[in-house]
Amino acid sequence: LKEAKERVATILQAQQIVQVVAETVQRSAHAQIASVVTRCLETVFGEEYGFRIDFERKRGRTEAKLIILKEGLVLDDPLNECGGGIIDLAALALRLISIVLSRPAKRRLLALDEPFRNVNGLEYRAAVNALLPMLAKELDLQLIIATGNDWLRVGKVVEL
């Protein structure tokens, strides 16, 4: 019985160590992911927008809740509260950072089909146009974008 109790104690200690390591990795990943997504949102839509990830343990598993902020407040339904352009841009930023953080390192190529169909307004479109080459260079990524939108012409354009 004593041996079984010692074994249980060892297992519980190991579980605590794994939990501490997992939380450290989550904080590090959160910092990298949130900074890229927030920067994209701020660049295009203004500094009042932000992004964070809330990690929560449920039934022995960690779940991540992706949260868009406006003026520091959580948007419960960002699609209806801000429009699809915010979602389009956040989705792109999440795709980009997932490629950058993937291990083993993957080829940094991302093909997108109409990624900004919900971005409306000349000022927002111009900001997206300026953001794309900057992100591609900074994150060492190649972007291939299929679109019928003339406003999205960035870099080398191939028409079919």
Roles of regions detected by a PLM:
Residues 1-50, 55:
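Charged, surface-exposed helical/loop "interaction arms" that form contiguous linear patches used
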Residues 117-119:
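ABC ATPase nucleotide-binding domain "signature" loop
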Residues 84-109:
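GG-anchored amphipathic helix commonly corresponding to the ABC/SMC/Rad50 NBD signature/C-loop
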Residues 53-57, 68-72, 94:
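Flexible glycine-/small-residue-rich
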Residues 59-64:
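A short, glycine/Asx- and small/polar-enriched loop/turn
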Residues 76-81:
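Short pre-catalytic strand/loop immediately N-terminal to key active-site residues, enriched for Gly-Thr
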